[in-house]
């Protein structure tokens, strides 16, 4: 119902794995099919070796992803097109894209282990080699938080309002965890930058839910046999999906409530409810 030519980028997403492509990218695809928020398309990137492989795979198929929902009734396949581009990890073009005023949200899925949390304290741990490297060489970031900071610093220097930073990882208070990591690294680099980030940058908390297993040759074969679709990296997932998000986006956001995202002032009650259901 839409073509890539109709879309304009508004979000850079760091860490384009299966969950992102079965969750955030699906919601945006559904929104674009309604003809809404067409200036909020995705640009992917990453900081891990696997991100480069993902980018190369997606580039070969025009950044399209086949998402296959599994249920008792069988399989349902949808080709999604909410991503416009994938930036090569480590390239300076990443910082320039984050500094582009059209980018109003930077989102990320880097898994729980990617937030540099000390398991003993539960707090941000600055004593990590990758963080020390980003503190010493902020212009060549190797972590998601170093990349986010490089983009924010460039916007600050150029007088461009900061983008919102939106974690899409399955973590309690994921926005607060992200905020601690970004500000923690900023304090290692530049105290004035850290103060500006703390004062000006939004880190909305969100609750995400969708079971999305890894992709293997089995899934590729099912897709080919059931639907006749060849996809280098399809995504299989459950048919249940949920996203509850704090409505804190100073530069605006896509109209995701039109496709079922719940916007709230505080996500905490929803997190507690999810934990009670899981523990029941």
Q: For each of these PLM feature ranges, what is it?
A:
Residues 1-280:
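Substrate/ligand-engaging "lid" and interaction regions
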């Amino acid at each position: 119902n839409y073509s890539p030519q109709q879309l304009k980028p508004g979000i850079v997403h760091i860490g384009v794995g299966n969950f992102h492509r079965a969750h955030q990218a699906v919601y945006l695809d559904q929104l674009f099919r309604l003809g809404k928020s067409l200036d909020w398309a995705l640009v992917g990137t990453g900081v891990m070796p696997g991100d480069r492989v993902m980018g190369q795979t997606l580039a070969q198929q025009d950044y399209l992803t086949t998402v296959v929902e599994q249920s008792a009734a069988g399989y349902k396949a949808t080709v999604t097109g909410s991503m416009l581009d994938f930036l090569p990890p480590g390239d300076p073009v990443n910082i320039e894209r984050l500094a582009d005023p059209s980018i109003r949200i930077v989102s990320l899925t880097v898994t729980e282990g990617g937030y540099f949390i000390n398991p003993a304290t539960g707090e941000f741990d600055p004593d990590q080699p990758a963080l020390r490297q980003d503190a010493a060489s902020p212009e060549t970031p190797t972590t998601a938080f170093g990349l986010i900071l490089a983009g924010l610093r460039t916007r600050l220097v150029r007088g461009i309002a900061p983008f919102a930073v939106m974690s899409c990882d399955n973590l309690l208070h994921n926005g607060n965890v992200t905020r601690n990591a970004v500000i923690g690294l900023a304090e290692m680099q530049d105290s004035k930058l850290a103060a500006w980030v703390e004062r000006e940058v939004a880190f909305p908390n969100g609750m995400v839910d969708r079971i999305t297993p890894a992709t293997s040759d089995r899934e590729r074969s099912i897709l080919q046999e059931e639907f006749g679709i060849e996809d280098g990296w399809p995504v299989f997932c459950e048919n249940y999906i949920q996203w509850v998000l704090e409505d804190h986006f100073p530069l605006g956001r896509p109209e995701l409530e039109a496709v079922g995202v719940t916007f709230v002032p505080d996500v905490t009650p929803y997190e507690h409810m999810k934990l009670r259901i899981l523990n029941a």
